[in-house]
């Protein structure tokens, strides 16, 4: 597995860790994940998924992201956060000759603020910006989720929306004039976008501290993304399942 593909597991790891996290402070596990890319002639990728989660009064860590709490009580949690964004484009991974002539888009580290409010279900929002001078973009995620528990089974459906700044979209989905001349694709300069999504996590606890989990997310891509000549899908998605142990 290449380094860049391993980094693409970040969102799966973070989601899986959150789904598997129970009453304990430290969770370890392993599973498998499938990522569906929106890029033209990109196949779905199947990866092994390590799950790591830690929670304390001052710090938290889930997958490839973590944070420091500025405020942490029963109903409200505000934290400074940083995480590795798994978005990337590797020209050689596409079967399209035109796509193979485009520039590489790199993954990056995003940093910002995260807030969770939990009286009725829970509201989750994060705003973060690129720190490595790759896209110089900003991403804002807002979601509402409701946790339903029946015995050892916990289901958490959610609905949300993701906003990408124009810099973010231009870096990952835009085609420069230089790339257009080299590849034969039309040039494209997208604006900012709103991308709604649905997600579902399931966790079943057995034998005390052991659990099996499943997580999935479906994102409907906006016209600013689907109009890109780099894209041939109207959606992106991920799914993961595995087993964990909570200490």
Where are these regions (language model features)?
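Extracytoplasmic loops and strand-loop junctions of Gram-negative outer membrane beta-barrel proteins
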Residues: 32-35, 94-98, 126-127, 180-186, ...
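Outer-membrane beta-barrel transmembrane domain signature
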Residues: 67-70, 131-133, 137-211, 215-225, ...
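Cleavable N-terminal export/targeting peptides
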Residues: 1-25, 41, 207
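Short glycine/proline- and aromatic-enriched beta-strand/turn motifs that initiate or cap beta-hairpins
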Residues: 21-69, 77, 167
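Repeated loop/turn-to-beta-strand initiation elements of outer-membrane beta-barrel proteins
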Residues: 26, 58-61, 78, 121-125, ...
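Transmembrane beta-barrel architecture of outer-membrane proteins
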Residues: 47-49, 63, 106-110, 137-141, ...
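Outer-membrane beta-barrel "beta-signal"
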Residues: 49-53, 234-247
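Transmembrane beta-barrel strands of outer-membrane/channel proteins
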Residues: 28-34, 63-65, 80-86, 125-129, ...
């Amino acid at each position: 597995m290449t380094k860049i593909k391993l980094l693409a597991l970040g969102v799966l790891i973070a989601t899986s860790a959150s789904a598997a996290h129970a009453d304990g402070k430290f969770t370890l596990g392993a599973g498998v994940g499938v990522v569906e890319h929106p890029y033209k002639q990109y196949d779905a990728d199947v990866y092994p998924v390590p799950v790591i989660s830690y929670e304390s009064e001052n710090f938290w860590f889930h997958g490839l992201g973590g944070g420091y709490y500025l405020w942490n009580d029963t109903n409200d949690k505000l934290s400074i956060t940083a995480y590795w964004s798994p978005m990337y484009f590797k020209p050689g991974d596409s079967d399209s000759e035109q796509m193979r002539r485009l520039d590489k888009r790199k993954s990056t580290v995003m940093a910002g603020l995260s807030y969770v409010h939990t009286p009725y279900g829970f509201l989750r929002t994060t705003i973060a910006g690129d720190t490595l001078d790759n896209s110089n973009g900003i991403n804002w995620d807002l979601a509402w989720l409701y946790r339903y528990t029946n015995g050892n089974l916990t289901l958490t459906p959610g609905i949300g929306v993701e906003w990408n700044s124009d810099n973010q979209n231009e870096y990952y989905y835009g085609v420069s004039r230089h790339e257009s001349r080299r590849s034969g694709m039309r040039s494209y300069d997208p604006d900012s976008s709103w991308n709604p999504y649905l997600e579902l996590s399931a966790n079943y606890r057995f034998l005390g501290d052991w659990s099996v989990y499943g997580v999935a997310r479906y994102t409907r891509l906006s016209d600013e993304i689907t109009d890109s000549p780099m894209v041939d899908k109207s959606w992106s998605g991920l799914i993961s399942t595995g087993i964990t142990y909570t200490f």
